[in-house]
């Protein structure tokens, strides 16, 4: 696809199967991780092997773009749509996983490669969200967005260090009742808001709230909703 479109603008969306279940990878790569010392938290050699093969696949694309001489005019974005699924994997030090309102479900990898525009090794702690991709791509293509999109141009957000922009998640549904022998759901209806270092979660079933300071408590172990009513009220 890339070779046949290298002389004209193109958009490629490639969704790898890895690292979804069923967990499987070449035996030689699995053995490589089986022979490594056991880690403290992440101890699944098959999962590790799948990640390596995913990395190999991304590397092939990067090399092909470089060999065709279009590297400096091509933006590569590596992104995950959600956190790892429990109990298949452990998202430590984050709490929760895919479908949950916690950081283990929503804090995901995002890497952008754009030679000549983004210096290698650049890092930022400014939060962005998936709905930002649409306005970002439109602006990069020198187009105009229609209506009033929820997202913002990622490059402008990072450039201006808009740390105070609130981010919202709304999940009014029940997700997959396969936990505990089919007796429980992976996720129940919730909404959440990220405001600076703070995150507020509202659970629709019992109308309870959870408030966490992610800067001080990334693992979301201390619910501050009852201890910091002022911040809870401002976030609401």
Predicted features and spans:
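Non-transmembrane alpha-helical segments in soluble domains
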Residues: 2-3, 55-62, 66, 134-138, ...
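Soluble non-cytosolic domains of exported or imported proteins
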Residues: 41, 45-48, 52-55, 124-128, ...
